[in-house]
């Protein structure tokens, strides 16, 4: 907090992809020409009104945007404090926020003449979104997925295969998201001529954190319009779960310069912060992974430690570099929720709202359960319901001993 605060929290990154000391592009020499080619192509697409018009058309007619801003009336009554709204990204085509970003990247890949798309996935939602868009546009799709995640996210594995994607289980490391990303990067280095790497979160080398944020920003832009229309003012607080952090960044970014809006990011505390967890801000330190500098779970020798979360989409040992910077300058408050707290919130949402949340946003909902009761009734809180929980039912049932 001894940093000089910027005039705007929305002006980053700089031309080399840095948010303060975070971000950048730490990649193999063979990848640098691709990174620079991607940066140039994205800058050109961003300035092309036809690209934006085409994307907006697909977002409306294919993805189903805008997604609703829903007043969670029974949860609000249950907690007895803040008025709670859900941004219903779970209602998008493919069932999560991931498709917003994938659409943009696949359109960019086509513009660049790439015919083969690779992606990493944890919970499977980014993989499903990538497989979906590749099917729509007739592109080859290969998805890397940790073997552990393949087992606990079988419904999404079947969806990807049904959509024509090749799912490659990864059996190195902890067999989860970090390892899938490692394999995808190896593939990209080997197949630079025809392959586009579609990263699913606001991590990776520049320009990915910026690009994914820009494609996800539609979430917060819609919330801004919807809450002004519904309540006549901006929300008092925003809350979202954070693994890499794309759903959170999509919600947060349009509000970063609104000083009156308090922002909460919720990491996965797993079995507890003194045990196995995936809370990079709470339990990590700055280091370099997957092409960018950010907060990472590392040992004293700088080796990456394995992350754990009941949620396959949150068990990543790092966090997006812009989130790391927003933490350091004090603009976003980072909290964490354990597996047990997320399961309790999952059950509560099912029973009170008739909405089965993904385990990822259930972590954010767990902190709503802590915050909402102590806030006044006129406090407007918006939670990003980033995905639906069909994919998690078998996993939840197993953890609850089959008793919901």
From Swiss-Prot:
Keywords: Amino-acid biosynthesis, Aromatic amino acid biosynthesis, Lyase, Pyridoxal phosphate, Tryptophan biosynthesis. It is an enzyme of class 4 (lyase). It comes from the Bacteria. One of its GO terms (cellular component) is cytoplasm. The keyword Transferase does not apply. It catalyses: (1S,2R)-1-C-(indol-3-yl)glycerol 3-phosphate + L-serine = D-glyceraldehyde 3-phosphate + L-tryptophan + H2O. It holds the Pfam family PALP. GO terms for molecular function: tryptophan synthase activity. Signal peptide: none annotated. Tetramer of two alpha and two beta chains. The beta subunit is responsible for the synthesis of L-tryptophan from indole and L-serine. Belongs to the TrpB family. This is Tryptophan synthase beta chain. It comes from Rhodopseudomonas palustris (strain BisB5).
